[in-house]
Structures are given as structure tokens and as C-alpha cells.
């Protein structure tokens, strides 16, 4: 079934501030912070810098987007620096397509470790 954007696979992640509250949704529903994978920030999500709240957001987005906890854990710190740390303060959106493009760039630039066992 297509989502509200007309694409079955396309998700839309959105972050905004309402007063002091930070709201992050995926296709209009609250994003699960995934504290079960790693609890960086018990106070929740943040963005626009490279701290613990942005790490929690990066992990939550990738876990939801990828549907693979191991892949999310492998990439979320790099995703945090590449995307989350650069998001504007008041409001932002990221689509599945944009996330896929970023993940591909991160894979392409990851150094190959030869002889590591």
C-alpha cells in the first residue's frame, strides 16, 4: 500500500520543535527512540550537533529505515556526523531516498581493512 507520498517504499522523517519539545516522526507517527539498542540520551532526540541526542536520533532513524538493527548499529555514528549534525535547528525532513544515498556514500568511502581478522 502506498504511503501518503504515493510511494510504497518511501518514508518521510520529520523533526520540529514545539516550544521546548522536540518532535520526530516517520510518516506522521512518533519515531521509536530504540533505547533497546543503545541508550545514548534518556532525554530523547536532538540534532544540529554531534552529541548524545543526535546519536540517539541517528540510531532510531537507521533502525527504522533499514529494518536491520545490526546495520543501524554499524552506520549510525557516521550517519550522525554526515546528516544529523548538519540539520537545521527548527525543522527538517529526510526521505528514504536521501537516507539511502547517504548510506551508499558512507559505504563507498569506508576504508578497506586488509589483513584484519
Task: Identify the residue ranges that each predicted region occupies.
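Short intrinsically disordered terminal tails
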Residues: 1, 111-117
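Short, compact, well-ordered microdomains
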Residues: 67-108
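Amphipathic alpha-helical packing elements
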Residues: 9, 20-81
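Long, low-hydrophobicity ectodomains and other hydrophilic envelope-associated domains
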Residues: 2-9, 13
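Short, ordered beta-strand-loop transition motifs
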Residues: 15-19
Amino acid at each position: 500500500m502506498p504511503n501518503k507520498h504515493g510511494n510504497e517504499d518511501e518514508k518521510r522523517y520529520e523533526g520540529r520543535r514545539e516550544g521546548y519539545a522536540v518532535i520526530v516522526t516517520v510518516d506522521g507517527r512518533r519515531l521509536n527512540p530504540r533505547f533497546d539498542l543503545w541508550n545514548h540520551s534518556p532525554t530523547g532526540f536532538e540534532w544540529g550537533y554531534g552529541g548524545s541526542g543526535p546519536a540517539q536520533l541517528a540510531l532510531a532513524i537507521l533502525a527504522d529505515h533499514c529494518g536491520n538493527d545490526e546495520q543501524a548499529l554499524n552506520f549510525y555514528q557516521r550517519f550522525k556526523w554526515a546528516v544529523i549534525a548538519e540539520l537545521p535547528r527548527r525543522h527538517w525532513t529526510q526521505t528514504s531516498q536521501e537516507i539511502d544515498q547517504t548510506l551508499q556514500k558512507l559505504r563507498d568511502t569506508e576504508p578497506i581493512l586488509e589483513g584484519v581478522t
